[in-house]
């Protein structure tokens, strides 16, 4: 059950401004918000194409990655970013913390999927999605939800899990999508007056847990710990 509000995930090869790793160094540190399984594949591809580099990856949630970058602004510890939400990436471009990089074939990438100056290049789109465990729903005699509004049904109390929007890019996507979907006038009013906040307050009454990972709600739901996980799907 995908919902509107597609956001880009970005893949850039951008050396931080002031980064202390010069050309010829063997070690490259990569920060990433990609899922662990994806990082493994990215590392395989990178090490195959760049055998002379020792690529070290550090995986962080979307919010944690941003906080770490800011904390290290005067003493950068990373050289590259793989897979970070463009909504976050765009906040760091004006801060002068990213150097443009245009990969081979840059001119073939549609304008919507890249920064015009080359600060980021998109690798995919991802959408907010509801992930029900049909077995749990059947065992507990719970109805199959058809959309977000159905999650307000008190029968789901304690059976929902969602990523924390303060630390998870997926959680941020979900909240941002709801703000757009539930209030047609969202562009003309302060965000705190958006009608979706009333919905989120009611949803909170049914929420069993908020977690920092965007994929964990789907995984825990699949394991049978929850009936419905608020997670994401790639497009």
Task: Give residue ranges: language-model regions.
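Extracytoplasmic ligand-binding site segments that recognize negatively charged/polar headgroups
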Residues: 33-40, 63, 77-223
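C-terminal lobe and pocket-closing loops
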Residues: 222, 227-235
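Bacterial N-terminal signal peptides that target proteins for export
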Residues: 1-9
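Boundary at the C-terminal end of the N-terminal hydrophobic targeting segment
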Residues: 22-24
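Short active-site oxyanion
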Residues: 27-29, 54-55, 77-79, 224-227
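Bacterial N-terminal signal peptides
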Residues: 9-19
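Short, polar/charged alpha-helical segment
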Residues: 28-58, 130
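Short, well-structured alpha-helical segments in soluble
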Residues: 67-75
């Amino acid at each position: 059950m995908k919902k509107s509000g597609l956001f880009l995930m970005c893949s850039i090869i951008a050396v931080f401004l002031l980064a202390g790793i010069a050309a010829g160094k063997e070690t490259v540190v990569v920060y990433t918000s990609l899922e662990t399984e994806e990082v493994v594949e990215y590392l395989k591809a990178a090490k195959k194409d760049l055998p002379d580099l020792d690529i070290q990856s550090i995986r962080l949630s979307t919010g944690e990655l941003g906080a770490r970058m800011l904390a290290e602004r005067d003493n950068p510890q990373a050289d590259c970013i793989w897979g970070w939400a463009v909504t976050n990436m765009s906040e760091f471009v004006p801060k002068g913390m990213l150097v443009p990089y245009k990969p081979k074939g840059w001119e073939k990438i549609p304008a919507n999927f890249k920064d015009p100056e080359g600060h980021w290049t998109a690798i995919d789109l991802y959408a907010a999605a509801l992930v029900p465990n049909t077995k749990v729903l059947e065992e507990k005699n719970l109805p199959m939800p058809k959309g977000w509004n159905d999650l307000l049904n008190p029968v789901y109390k304690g059976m929902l899990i969602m990523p924390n929007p303060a630390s998870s890019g997926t959680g941020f996507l979900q909240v941002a999508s709801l703000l757009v979907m539930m209030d047609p006038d969202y562009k003309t009013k302060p965000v705190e007056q958006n009608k979706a906040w009333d919905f989120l307050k009611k949803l909170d009454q049914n929420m069993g847990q908020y977690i920092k990972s965007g994929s964990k709600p789907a995984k825990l739901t699949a394991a049978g710990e929850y009936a419905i996980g608020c997670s994401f799907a790639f497009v």
